[in-house]
Amino acid sequence: MAFAAVFSIVVLVHEFGHFIIARKAGVKVYEFSIGFPFSPKVLTLFRNKETEFTLRLLPLGGFVSFSKEEDGGADDLFKASYLNRVLIMSAGPLSNIVFAFLVLVPVFILGRQLLITEAVLASAKTVWLILSGTVVVIFNFFSGNGSWEGLAGPVGIAVVAGQAASKGLWSLIYFTAILSMSLGVMNLVPLPALDGGHIFMLLIEAVRKKPLSLKTYQAVNLIGLSIFLILTVLVTYKDIIKLIA
């Protein structure tokens, strides 16, 4: 239960970042969804202008869709300027990081009895330490110098969320901030299907002064999603073995 609540909040913050900047840039968002993109739509929560807010069958992850078509056809995002597209893509991860900072301030004030100025500084320091630590773990993993021990899948995160919840509200909120920061940094990695991957592809377009085709985007994203599904399965297997060992 704690895992579902924490993960939903973190994903909502991330997708809202994309959503609000897209709206500001005049890019239409046709769906705002909580759940894995390719899982069936089970519920329409409400509608606002052209946006349908939905819940998918697999409630892990989330996305905003800039296309009217289920298969991700041409959308308004491709018509936006390079700058606006970069801002939209980076808004999700940055929202996670800002959210973590804002959440940690009351944790330090109410949970650890610090003064406001002390809490702000402690929050900023914590954000920096977690961000830099996450970057090191990710870099070491992809460079071959790290191990699986630094990674956690849904099962591992659920276990830690449960442990945090058992220690009280402030521990759970602190864990939420850490998860939010980790999600933000992970999404900035320049790999397919991640926000960082989209930004990297935009840089390629800017250098070659020619847009990549929609089919190229779809193929790259499909490959990226497949890779991350495989990684998720492997990490989840590791978490389960660790749990029952």
Name the predicted role of every residue range:
Residues 1-73, 189, 194-208:
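Small-residue-rich helix-interface/hinge motifs
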Residues 2-5, 13, 24, 62, ...:
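Internal alpha-helical transmembrane segments
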Residues 10-13, 22, 26, 60, ...:
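Alpha-helical transmembrane segments of polytopic integral membrane proteins
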Residues 34, 63, 93-95, 134, ...:
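Long, contiguous hydrophobic alpha-helical segments, chiefly transmembrane helices and signal peptides
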Residues 75-90, 105-183, 203-223, 234, ...:
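Functional transmembrane alpha-helices
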Residues 146-151, 188-194:
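Short helix-coil transition sites and intra-membrane helix breaks within transmembrane domains
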